[in-house]
Amino acid sequence: MSKKYSNKGYQARNAVQPKKDNTNVIITWVTVGLCLTVMAAIVIAIMAGTGAFSPKAADVDMNEIKSEINSLTAEDFAETNEVTEYVKITVKDYGEIVLRLRPDIAPKTVENFQKLVKEGHYSDKIFHRVIQNFMIQGGGFDGTGKQHEADTVKGEFSDNGYDNNLLHVRGVISMARLGNDNDSASNQFFICDATSSHLDGGYAAFGYVLAGMDVVDAIAAVDTDGNDKPYDNVIIEKAVFVDPLK
């Protein structure tokens, strides 16, 4: 005969059992549930703070940035061998464009761009796609039309789960990519010749022009073919790091 344990020794299976009080059991499970809920909330908060879900870029004051765009000249900067947040692009027959990079907004994008500049990747590349009142795009092809590849980088923009709040206003630099692949940006960049709000959230803006918007405008005005390629090559002679003199 099977038996059960009780406080008074064995009890027969068919013996009348006292009715159990489940109050303490219910309270215990409610307490456990509340504890698990609180712990889950804490974990989520911690992971959100470290960028595990939707990374938070630096807050951006677009009015301040607009006031910075094209506020200086190339003569306000000096070349340096150090990796900095300032890059000067020299365009043959056109002049110089000085960029300020913003790693606080798009860190991986800036890191990739700095790596390419340091390697001399942009020397003798062209602006191969030019659309006036929109943008100038380059960095991936040389004058012969040969495409040069580079490592891809995760797309740091909101459509790809990253909180990039730098808007595509005139003078902003951003990464080109394949339309169907958010993580396909590599070496091709574009500079906005006009505000292009339809790009916000879908492309990784990572800096802006501090000097040389007249150069950008001159390039944007060149004659192009049906594929938006300039008839005459617009050649990037070099891209180097610079430091402000003041």
Regions found by a protein language model. Give the residues of each.
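Cyclophilin-like peptidyl-prolyl cis-trans isomerases
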Residues: 2-246
